[in-house]
């Protein structure tokens, strides 16, 4: 799983199901693909979204700011700063400073995420606030590790009563990951389509898959409902690749 796919998975796992979730997923995809580089418009859109908690808005604002690199000099937004202040608790700020010093020594996404997971959500949010307010700097990869650790903490607290102790984290994150991977696979199918008769068939399958993912995000579904979605798509893609003589490994 690529870094941006992982970030998208974790961030979407804390967004409540509904039309807004599908909209946010599309915004994230566009930002990560470099198709949306207007940070000011993105932030204004995010600020006025209903339903989302201030912390979720803060995390999304932080991710948008990290990703739209050409706009890093833009003025910081108050709604993000307020969300990432650790509820104004000085203990959170103290822990955030300690975490920041540890993160400065990390160079990988997974290393940063591992370190961050031992801190509370308030301390993690405060640490994001330090970075957002330019009081500290880390690599984008390390910052994304911090984001995903925060989302995992939030998702865990939302689903603690249902949590299964398995290596692939909680059901909500697994569910979101299947949908993100299904979307990614559908995109790959569309890019490979060409102009043959089979290509039209594959385009149709990919289009249906994208619509299904959007519908699942909009209406909300049980975490187990997406289990077969990615596998069905991968099977279709691999069958198509065999027919076209394309290497399969690339999309596993």
UniProtKB/Swiss-Prot annotation:
Region Membrane-binding: start-end pairs: 1-164
UniProt membrane topology term: Peripheral membrane protein
Domain of life: Viruses
Motif (Nuclear localization signal): 101-105
GO cellular component assignments: host cell nucleus; membrane; virion membrane
Localization per record: Virion membrane; Host nucleus
Additional free-text comment from the UniProt record: Most abundant protein in virion. When expressed alone can form virus-like particles in transfected cells.
Subunit structure: Homodimer and homomultimer. Interacts with NEP. Binds ribonucleocapsid by both interacting with genomic RNA and NP protein. May interact with HA and NA. Cannot bind NP without genomic RNA.
Protein name: Matrix protein 1
Gene this chain is encoded by: M
């Amino acid at each position: 799983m690529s870094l941006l796919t992982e970030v998208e998975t974790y961030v979407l796992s804390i967004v409540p199901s509904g039309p807004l979730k599908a909209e946010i997923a599309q915004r994230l995809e566009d930002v990560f693909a470099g198709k949306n580089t207007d940070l000011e418009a993105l932030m204004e859109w995010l600020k006025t979204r209903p339903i989302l908690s201030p912390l979720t808005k803060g995390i999304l604002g932080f991710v948008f700011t990290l990703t739209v690199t050409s706009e890093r000099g833009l003025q910081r937004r108050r709604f993000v700063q307020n969300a990432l202040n650790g509820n104004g608790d000085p203990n959170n700020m103290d822990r955030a400073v300690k975490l920041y010093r540890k993160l400065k020594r990390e160079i990988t996404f997974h290393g940063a995420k591992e370190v961050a997971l031992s801190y509370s959500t308030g301390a993690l949010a405060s640490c994001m606030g330090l970075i957002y307010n330019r009081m500290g700097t880390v690599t984008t990869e390390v910052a994304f590790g911090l984001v995903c650790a925060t989302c995992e903490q939030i998702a865990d607290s939302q689903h603690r009563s249902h949590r299964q102790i398995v290596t692939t984290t909680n059901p909500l994150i697994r569910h979101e990951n299947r949908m993100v991977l299904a979307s990614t696979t559908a995109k790959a199918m569309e890019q490979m389509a060409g102009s043959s008769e089979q290509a039209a068939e594959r385009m149709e399958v990919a289009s249906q898959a994208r619509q299904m993912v959007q519908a699942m995000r909009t209406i909300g579904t049980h975490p187990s409902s997406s289990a077969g979605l990615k596998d069905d798509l991968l099977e279709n893609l691999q069958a198509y690749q065999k027919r076209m003589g394309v290497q399969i490994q690339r999309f596993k």
